[in-house]
Amino acid sequence: MPRRFSSLFRQHLDPFTRAWADEVYADRRTDLATLLTFRELVEHVPEVLEELGRLLDERADAEEICEGARRLRGYARVRFHQGVLIDEVARELMLLRGTLFEFLWQEARGLTEDDPRLLRDALRRAEIFFDELLVEAVLVYASSLRPVVPTRGSVWPPPRRRRQP
C-alpha cells in the first residue's frame, strides 16, 4: 500500500506541530507551557506521527496498533521524569488527538476521495492508537509510583496439609 499517511504527516509536520503547540499553550488546565520548553514539548511529535502514519498506511489491526503504542512508552517515561502530572499527559494526548483529527478532516480527504470509508477507518485506527498511548502513560506512571514491595513465591497447587489429631 502506498505510504500516503506517512508522507502527508511528513509534509505537514511543522504546521501541524505549531497548531498543536498553540492548543497546548491556550489550554489553561495544564502547566505544560510553563513546565516545558517548546523543544521539550514537541520533541515526541515526529515519532508519534511516524508510528501512526506507518500503522495507518498498513491498515494495522488492533493488536498491531497496541504494539505501536507500546513502542512509544518512552514518551510517558520522559514526561514522568520531567515532572509532568498524569492528568497533564492525558490532556496533552487528548489535544494531540483533537489536532490530528482536525488535520485529517482537512488534509486527508484528498487521499481518500475514491473511498470515504478509508478516512473513517483511519480515524478509527487513530482513536485506538491514542487510547493505547493513554493506557501506556497510565502504566508507566503507575509502575513508577508504586513502592517496592517484597513478594513471596507462589506454589501451585498448594501442598496438602496434614490434619492435626
Regions found by a protein language model. Give the residues of each.
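N-terminal low-complexity or simple alpha-helical regulatory segments
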Residues: 1-87
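Long, amphipathic alpha-helical coupling/dimerization segments that relay conformational signals between
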Residues: 2-8, 60, 64-165
